[in-house]
């Protein structure tokens, strides 16, 4: 009987630990989005293909770049 109780406790602990683990997601990068060219939040991505000359590019370390906002030199569109 003790072995059955221990087995149930161990299986329950295994189930809880397995469900608590976070899923790892691999983010696909285009060549111009690799970490060396895009580390941290910045607005200096003018030469990147993800934005045009009037939009700011923001890249978070380990994520794809996002084009947000309009540069002051372009005014409102």
UniProtKB/Swiss-Prot annotation:
Location within or outside the cell: Secreted
Molecular function per GO: calcium channel regulator activity; sodium channel regulator activity; toxin activity
Chief location: secreted
Extent of the signal sequence: 1-20
Tissues where the protein occurs: Expressed by the venom gland.
Modified residues (Cysteine amide): 74
Any one GO cellular component localisation term in the record: extracellular region
Disulfide topology: 38-51, 45-57, 50-67, 54-74, 59-65
Proregion residues excised on maturation: 21-34
O-palmitoyl serine lipid attachment residues: 73
Keywords noted in UniProt: Amidation, Calcium channel impairing toxin, Disulfide bond, Ion channel impairing toxin, Knottin, Lipoprotein, Neurotoxin, Palmitate, Presynaptic neurotoxin, Secreted, Signal, Toxin, Voltage-gated sodium channel impairing toxin
Comment block on domains: The presence of a 'disulfide through disulfide knot' structurally defines this protein as a knottin.
Other comment: Negative results: has no significant effect on voltage-gated potassium current in Drosophila giant neurons.
Function text: Excitatory toxin that acts on both calcium and sodium (Nav) channels. It preferentially blocks a subset of calcium channels that is apparently not required for neurotransmitter release, it decreases threshold for sodium channel activation and it slows sodium channel inactivation. As it enhances synaptic transmission by prolonging presynaptic release of neurotransmitter, its effects on sodium and calcium channels may act synergistically to sustain the terminal excitability.
Similarity comment: Belongs to the neurotoxin 02 (plectoxin) family. 01 (Tx3) subfamily.
The protein, known as: Delta/omega-plectoxin-Pt1a
């Amino acid at each position: 009987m003790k072995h059955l109780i221990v087995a149930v406790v161990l299986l329950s602990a295994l189930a809880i630990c397995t469900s608590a683990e976070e899923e790892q997601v691999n983010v696909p990068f285009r060549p111009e989005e690799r970490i060396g060219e895009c580390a941290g939040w910045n607005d200096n991505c003018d030469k990147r293909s993800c934005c045009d000359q009037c939009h700011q590019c923001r890249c978070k370390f380990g994520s794809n770049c996002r084009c947000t906002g309009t540069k002051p030199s372009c005014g409102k569109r």
